[in-house]
């Protein structure tokens, strides 16, 4: 069941694509999207890409194609859209796909976990658990994954920005509800180069100081004939990463490419993506939070830096567990985020008889990987944890590392801080995250006496597999930012109650929640229609989308424990006396079908060629997926209530756009009402989530370009409240967790001849760590700085420092999000500390 459906999709689409050239013969009109791509590539090829993108940072005359039926300028549209070119992305210091989004107003991207698994929100829509539930990542207009918040498999994990990316278009607000399924909040479209003109780049990046990374990027493309062109590029890298974990945690790379054949009236394109990459997983770490709930003081612990410390260690790289089939599985912790993608896709556009235009896109991806990272479930004194595990009189010894086997006579002096952590190893195998998507549309333009009319009819189909195997274990570990060791516990009777640092198979302190497996499939079908009318200076547009989801499959957890000799040494150690195993005989079904009608209607009025007003009303939906499993969201027969399976988001927005020769300003007021059903496995007080939210605010995005000086800036004011909570009514009226009132960014730069210097400032005001609104997370400002020197027209060198001032910026608090603890101990995740790297680039 896992691959046959995807293969059937591949065959059907391949046959369709094979028929397209014959149908396209003798057509003679150019398509709007190809025109936009061509214009952009030509600009980038003349005088270098950086110079092309130096043009106005918020260019309201730029044509955009994302979540819109036709290519249209920002000034002429009624949608909120931002665009980042490749040079802007490089100068911002963005390391991953989610990092790029921090520079966009209205977007809150918590990318503190490394190059994947980011938490992403837009305009106050909640991040109740993890991922980006109400947004969609796209690659050339097609979803990377159907859902943005799949546990341990978020779309940014399967997308690696590199030299292939020409620009990123970000559409915020309800217009995306009509042009994409499961994206009522925003669409992030990563658009690749298509080889309009001959050329490319090669770049080398080398980390400095504690930043251990080496990376080679390249891309090249150009015409093959007058009507055929290509582009190919990718990267390879290795190193420990942003934190010194003591082993190679970054390794692998990516290769992407496409070939385009222009025909009369359109084009045919085939593309591919190959990704096999490993990145370290950065989860919360131990730290000190003292002071008051309203004004806490956040500091590193002795021997453990909040910014650069990690629980990963060269002394702990192997985990033994039982998988869903009951077989032994050995995991290499160095795999971290292991992401594998083998994808092919295609796009075609041409005219039919009667002035109708056909646009066809498909993507078929075989996705798989794993997620492995240490999570500090509890931090306390080593003596207290020894007693918690082994009872009164329990003693400690080193389980591995340079002191393996030695007794710890003075736990209060352990690692210079006297602390230890009960660590839960998040260990998830992702054998099948395959998806197949297809989007077919027909469009036509009409000239009427009152103005031009554009009409689009389309049909979207996708199949998303989600197959996961969770096998978490519990360990005891020293609190050291580098080279930490596992600990053993011996009870007062002299009996070892741990084994090589292993406290338990599974996570008994969390009720063994996280020994589970599931094999589910979600099929989306969505016919849609949109139209626009431009009478004079007005532009009216609207659309309808009818989404249907069909869910099938099964899921199973553990039921009780068994005595199993997991390590096959012939001895039953204490952890082997209570081993949780997935009970496949008690697997529960998933079997339901749900529908929802979505709409979006907008208007834009050009007061002058440089000033416009716009407004929009939308109702979108997010169809829930694996987050309903295990949380009580499904009935025993596999069905789900409509309000649980489908979460509706109603949005209203309006604003003004203004542009002059040197400046641009985009101001948008917004209002959103959101339903949310979810689960959070790391929360032991609010595991189930059933809430409604209301958020309102204002977005500001502007730019100033004057001579050698350029600046892009933005800010978002958000007033968000929980308006209903079926699980915890006491939270009604509170601010959602981690939602700041203000989020802001600014990117100034100045060119001194061949030298360009600049910075990116990313900031947030304070927010609450949890929905009860007890403990505050302080606001912070992160500063990234760069300097680039053009040696000649082809060669440049640059120096980049991310988080220049090594700021602590908390994005979540985990162990005690409600209040400062008496001992000041807690766990939290911060933005990465200072990383400095040098780059060399040569234009081919």
Regions found by a protein language model. Name each.
Residues 97-100, 120-123, 135-138, 155-158, ...:
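N-terminal periplasmic accessory domains that precede
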């Amino acid at each position: 069941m896992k691959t046959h459906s995807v293969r059937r999709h591949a065959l059907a689409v391949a046959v369709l694509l094979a028929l397209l050239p014959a149908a396209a013969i003798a057509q003679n009109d150019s398509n709007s999207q190809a025109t936009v791509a061509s214009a952009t590539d030509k600009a980038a090829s003349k005088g270098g890409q950086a110079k092309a993108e130096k043009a106005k940072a918020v260019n309201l005359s730029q044509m955009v194609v994302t979540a819109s039926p036709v290519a249209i300028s920002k000034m002429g549209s009624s949608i909120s859209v931002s665009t980042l070119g490749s040079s802007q992305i490089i100068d911002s210091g963005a390391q991953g796909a989610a990092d790029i989004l921090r520079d966009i107003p209205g977007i809150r991207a918590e990318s503190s976990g490394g190059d994947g698994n980011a938490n992403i929100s837009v305009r106050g829509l909640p991040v109740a658990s993890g991922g980006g539930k109400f947004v969609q990542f796209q690659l050339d207009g097609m979803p990377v994954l159907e859902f943005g918040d799949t546990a341990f498999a978020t779309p940014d994990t399967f997308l690696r920005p590199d030299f292939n990316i020409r620009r990123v278009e970000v559409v915020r607000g309800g217009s995306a509800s009509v042009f994409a399924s499961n994206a009522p909040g925003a669409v992030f479209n990563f658009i690749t180069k298509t080889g309009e003109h001959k050329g490319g780049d090669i770049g080398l990046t080398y980390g400095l100081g504690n930043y251990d990374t080496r990376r080679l990027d390249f891309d090249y493309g150009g015409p093959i004939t007058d009507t055929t062109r290509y582009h190919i590029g990718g990267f390879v890298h290795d190193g420990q990463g942003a934190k010194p974990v003591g082993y190679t945690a970054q390794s692998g790379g990516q290769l992407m490419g496409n070939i385009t054949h222009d025909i009369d009236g359109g084009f045919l394109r085939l593309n591919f993506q190959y990704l096999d990459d490993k990145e370290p997983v950065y989860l919360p770490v131990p730290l000190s939070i003292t002071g008051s709930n309203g004004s806490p003081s956040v500091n590193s612990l002795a021997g453990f830096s909040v910014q650069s410390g990690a629980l990963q260690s060269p002394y702990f790289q192997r985990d033994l567990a039982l998988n869903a089939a009951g077989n032994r599985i050995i995991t290499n912790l160095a795999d971290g985020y292991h992401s594998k993608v083998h994808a092919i896709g295609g796009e075609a556009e041409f005219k039919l008889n009667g002035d109708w235009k056909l646009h066809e896109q498909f993507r078929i991806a075989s996705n798989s990987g794993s997620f492995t990272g240490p999570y500090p479930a509890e931090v306390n004194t080593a003596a207290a944890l020894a007693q918690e595990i082994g009872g009164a009189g329990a003693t400690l010894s080193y389980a591995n590392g340079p002191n393996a086997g030695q007794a710890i006579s003075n736990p209060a002096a352990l690692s210079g801080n006297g602390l230890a952590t009960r660590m839960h190893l998040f260990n998830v195998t992702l054998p099948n995250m395959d998806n197949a998507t297809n989007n077919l549309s027909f469009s036509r333009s009409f000239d009427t006496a009152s103005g031009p009319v554009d009409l689009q009819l389309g049909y979207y189909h996708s199949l998303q597999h989600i197959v996961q195997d969770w096998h978490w274990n519990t360990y005891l570990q020293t609190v050291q930012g580098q080279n930490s060791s596992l600990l053993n516990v011996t009870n007062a009777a002299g009996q070892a109650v741990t084994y090589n640092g292993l406290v338990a198979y599974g996570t008994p302190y969390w009720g063994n929640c996280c020994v589970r497996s599931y094999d589910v499939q979600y099929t989306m079908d969505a016919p849609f229609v949109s139209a626009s009318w431009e009478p004079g200076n007005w532009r009216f547009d609207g659309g309808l989308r009818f989404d249907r989801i069909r869910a099938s499959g099964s899921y199973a957890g553990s039921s009780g424990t068994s005595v199993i000799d997991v390590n096959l040494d012939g001895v039953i150690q204490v952890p082997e006396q209570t081993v949780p195993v997935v009970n496949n005989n008690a697997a529960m079904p998933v079997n339901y079908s749900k529908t929802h009608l979505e709409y979006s209607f907008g208007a834009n009025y050009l007061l002058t060629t440089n000033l416009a007003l716009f407004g929009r009303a939308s109702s979108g939906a997010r169809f829930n997926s694996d987050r309903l499993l295990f949380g009580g969201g499904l009935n025993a027969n596999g069905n789900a209530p409509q309000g649980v399976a489908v979460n509706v988001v109603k949005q209203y927005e309006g604003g003004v756009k203004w542009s002059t020769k040197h400046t641009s300003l985009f101001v948008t007021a917004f209002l959103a009402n959101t339903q949310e059903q979810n689960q959070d496995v790391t929360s032991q007080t609010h595991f189930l989530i059933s809430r409604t939210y209301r958020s309102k605010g204002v977005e500001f995005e502007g730019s100033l370009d004057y001579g050698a000086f350029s600046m892009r800036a933005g800010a978002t004011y958000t007033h968000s409240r929980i308006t209903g909570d079926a699980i915890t009514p006491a939270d009604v009226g509170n601010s959602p967790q981690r939602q700041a009132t203000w989020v802001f960014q600014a990117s100034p730069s100045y060119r001194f001849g061949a030298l360009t210097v600049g910075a990116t400032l990313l900031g947030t005001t304070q927010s609450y760590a949890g929905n009860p609104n007890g403990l505050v997370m302080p606001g912070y400002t992160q500063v990234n700085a760069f300097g680039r020197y053009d040696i000649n027209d082809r060669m440049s060198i640059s120096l980049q420092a991310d988080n220049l001032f090594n700021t602590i910026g908390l994005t979540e608090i985990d162990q005690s999000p409600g209040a400062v603890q008496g001992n000041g101990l807690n766990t939290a995740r911060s933005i990465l500390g200072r990383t400095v790297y040098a780059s060399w680039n040569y234009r081919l």
